[in-house]
């Protein structure tokens, strides 16, 4: 804590500085830098440290550090504000709350593909960490000395949030000398309880349940629901053995490197051990059903460095329920003639969405009740239908007709965000440059996410020619509900023949520049939820295709 006098001086000084509003990820990172959770880091990495971390998993001082913690900005921030080496800037939250000053020592443009290959072992943007790096992270990194001013504010669960020094003090008060950390980004069920408690008892230690409440994988269950589940599962551990503390970490889903990173962080929080299980911090499977990392690759990497970083690993294989024994066992220990039971995260979500039974052997009834309250069935969740296609493809006509049709039997509020309507009321000052088109789609995505978050249906029908902005919307909206991308794939020749607004003719004559499909590209979706070519079908038939898809997938009933 700094004095009120010094805080006032900092605020007055900040009025004369350029400000950078931090993203959610950057806020997570700076909070953990300032608290000491990212020790030995004192600030965002400079260029030399960045290169050393990417290539060698070490800082230039020689200390192990596997994940680059960088502050990314766009080129316009540098050029518009005359940013150069030695410039001091103010770092703020979205509401303007002053966090820190940064005196810049490094400005560089990284090779993000090289970074992706080194950190994630992949450049496939189906991987959420790779996608964030290549499609969302800005093109310029800046590093330098931080002047800490105020930690980011949290209004939720203040009694469950601890800095490393606070948590170490708690351990001392309770007389805990050996502490096993259990990392999770999902609700805990019976198998997780068995793994965590067995890990602690094996090494005669106490247990810290240390879930991530910063950014996790897109589509994960929100942290409010998860924390309520963690609080309930605490009752199933013997009294005095287990503690819950929340970690405001922004995960990268980097598998082996992330496991090593998690070990370093938990060491800083005073833990002596960490549980590392199957595919720790992995993002799941790629679009072809293949894993990005070996099942125990994370364990192997942490084991290699555990002595050096000062934390021991408690490794666990996958746990399954054995019906004949009525208990959980490591999968490799189950005799072949016995039945192994398990429910994946995907299957659990399917059961919740469709009101199917969730057996007692899998989880506790109070956890199921909590999940059901926060995870209604599909037909009661918020939904965004995002149409994309060339001008004249039929997307606006289908979207309008679909809105009217759905209102016949839908209880959820339905909002149409048509491209022309949005341009008139939400983006009237924007032109048609790539930057402005992306901004227009981002605005549509934000409005749709708010509609979806509140249980409504948003029907969006812009051209949305660029894959990157569509993907950003998908990620944003998927945090709050369901996202359906509908590609109206009517070919250019058909759209140009229709040309109801005469725009194609003007584009061919050079009267309109940067017209999608003529002299500006349309990037077709690679894997849309639904694809419709309206060349040889009526509007009613196209609308019916969408209705049937929504019924089949359980989004409407």
Language-model regions: role of each:
Residues 396:
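Walker A/P-loop
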Residues 322, 489-545, 553-557:
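Small-molecule kinase domains that catalyze NTP-dependent phosphoryl transfer to phosphate-bearing small molecules
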Residues 387:
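Hydrophobic anchor at the beta1->P-loop junction of P-loop NTPases
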Residues 400-449, 453:
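Conserved substrate/cofactor phosphate-moiety recognition/catalytic segment
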Residues 1-379:
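Active-site cores that bind ATP or allylic diphosphates and position pyrophosphate for catalysis
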Residues 390:
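P-loop (Walker A) phosphate-binding loop of NTP-binding proteins
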Residues 425-431, 448-508, 514:
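ATP-dependent NMP and nucleoside kinases share a basic, alpha-helical "lid"
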